[in-house]
Amino acid sequence: MDKYAVFGNPIKHSKSPFIHTLFARQTMQDLEYSAIEAPINGFVESVTAFFSQQGKGCNVTVPFKEEAFQFADQLTERAKLAGAVNTLKKLDDGIILGDNTDGEGLVQDLLQYQVPLEDKHILLIGAGGAARGVILPLLKQNPASITLVNRTYEKAKQLAELFSPYGRIEAKKMSDINKGFDVIINSTSASLSGELPQIDPVIFSGGAISYDMMYGSGKTIFNQWALKNDAYQAYDGLGMLVGQAAESFTVWRGLRPGSKQILRELRKT
């Protein structure tokens, strides 16, 4: 039986084994998927041991995505630009391929909700690893523009410059934002810390779609704020989690599983 896993620390909370077990059942693939808590300073040793013991592929979550980027022998274009890897696959020749499926997970979730991205004005809040991983897939949807804002403007500016060859993207200071957008994506952990970005809620005016990469049992704090300020609709990041998992599964098995049923199951728990 082919072995797969997710590496992280902590990892007990991970929904990945549940998701991939359902994907395997749905696509009739014979595999096992486990959660492995690697020591903070022992990711390389743990993942090397996993691949030497017939491991076929793995997901990587915090805090090891940058280490996985360094560990991979070969990188996809989206992983190179993301600067982080969340999916490793052992190829037939023993080469370890590093990929990043986070952005594809976000885009697929937005499209599943029938959120149009082409020719739309997108505001991306945050300039950390989560933002960096989704910019290229968003640009590939041909939006009219992506505006990047961050608490530290310089970080947003550097990220906008990195991705400028791939599409229309610019960085702005939060204090300079004074208009509405079509789609607002929050890549910060604001909802977990109970804080809100220091930005004018006018961004939601005119029926914007709000998307928070965080998720919880109810509406996230960011999405509550969005709806209170005239956002048309608000979605959390649980579908992105399922979407990136589906993309990883496709990378490993060459089959794309359906996400809707799994998302329904997760909403029940």
From Swiss-Prot:
EC numbers, comma separated: 1.1.1.25
Entry GO CC: cytosol
Active-site residues per Swiss-Prot or TrEMBL entry: 65
Pathway: Metabolic intermediate biosynthesis; chorismate biosynthesis; chorismate from D-erythrose 4-phosphate and phosphoenolpyruvate: step 4/7
Any GO molecular function: shikimate 3-dehydrogenase (NADP+) activity
A GO BP entry: chorismate biosynthetic process
Pfam families, A to Z: SDH_C, Shikimate_DH, Shikimate_dh_N
Catalysed reactions listed for this entry: shikimate + NADP(+) = 3-dehydroshikimate + NADPH + H(+)
Enzyme class: oxidoreductase
Record-linked InterPro entries: Aminoacid_DH-like_N_sf, NAD(P)-bd_dom_sf, SDH_C, Shikimate_DH, Shikimate_DH-bd_N, Shikimate_DH_fam, Shikm_DH/Glu-tRNA_Rdtase
Cysteine disulfide links: none
Record-listed shikimate binding positions: 14-16, 61, 86, 102, 215
Residues annotated to bind NADP(+): 77, 126-130, 150-155, 213, 237
Keywords tagged on the record: Amino-acid biosynthesis, Aromatic amino acid biosynthesis, NADP, Oxidoreductase
Role played: Involved in the biosynthesis of the chorismate, which leads to the biosynthesis of aromatic amino acids. Catalyzes the reversible NADPH linked reduction of 3-dehydroshikimate (DHSA) to yield shikimate (SA).
Assembly and oligomerization: Homodimer.
Family indicated by similarity: Belongs to the shikimate dehydrogenase family.
Name of this chain's protein: Shikimate dehydrogenase (NADP(+))
Organism this protein belongs to: Aliivibrio fischeri (strain ATCC 700601 / ES114) (Vibrio fischeri)
Lineage: Bacteria, Pseudomonadati, Pseudomonadota, Gammaproteobacteria, Vibrionales
